[in-house]
């Protein structure tokens, strides 16, 4: 993506995941925003985005962070929200027996003590492949991949969801379900 598209994607991430109020935008309970309102409010706050740019960001985003509604009139982030009022309405899903979590090595000691918590987000994010987890962990420093025993978690009643982009979501992961390198 060009620098302009990367900037637009970062702006969308802020607005659709964390702070729609910064441009006076309201998300519905499932995280959807009206596209016309998003574009108008963004422009009125100095971030002019054309519909063509928006379409291109959504289409070219390698992590499939955003989705349009079937009619193309609404947009939302597929996961990663920190807004407590947003429930993107994903049904429970049965994960593979093992999923992966990518993190930076400097966080491993804390995770050993506390497990994985969502922090400022609504869910802990898990990856289906070790390669994806490595790339996630590398964003924050020297990557470490943790193995998550999702079969044991499910046996104890934990509920999983899978976002449209393949990211697995769960409320938290106790350290007992994590295999550390």
Task: Show the residue positions of the predicted features.
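Conserved NAD+-utilizing ADP-ribose enzyme module
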Residues: 1-124, 128-181
């Amino acid at each position: 993506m060009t620098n302009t598209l990367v900037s637009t994607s970062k702006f969308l991430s802020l607005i659709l995941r964390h702070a729609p109020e910064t441009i006076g935008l309201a998300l519905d309970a499932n995280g959807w925003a009206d596209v016309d309102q998003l574009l108008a409010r963004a422009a009125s706050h100095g971030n002019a985005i054309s519909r063509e740019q928006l379409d291109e960001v959504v289409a070219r985003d390698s992590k499939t962070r955003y989705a349009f509604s079937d009619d193309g009139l609404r947009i939302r982030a597929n996961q990663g929200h920190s807004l407590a009022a947003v429930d993107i309405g994903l049904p429970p899903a049965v994960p593979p027996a093992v999923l992966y979590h990518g993190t930076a090595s400097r966080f491993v000691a804390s995770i050993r003590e506390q497990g994985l918590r969502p922090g400022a987000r609504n869910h802990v994010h898990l990856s289906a492949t070790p390669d994806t987890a490595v790339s996630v962990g590398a964003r924050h420093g020297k990557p470490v991949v943790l193995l998550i025993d999702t079969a044991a978690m499910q046996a104890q009643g934990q509920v999983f969801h899978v976002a449209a982009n393949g990211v697995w979501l769960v409320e938290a992961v106790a350290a007992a379900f994590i295999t550390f390198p």
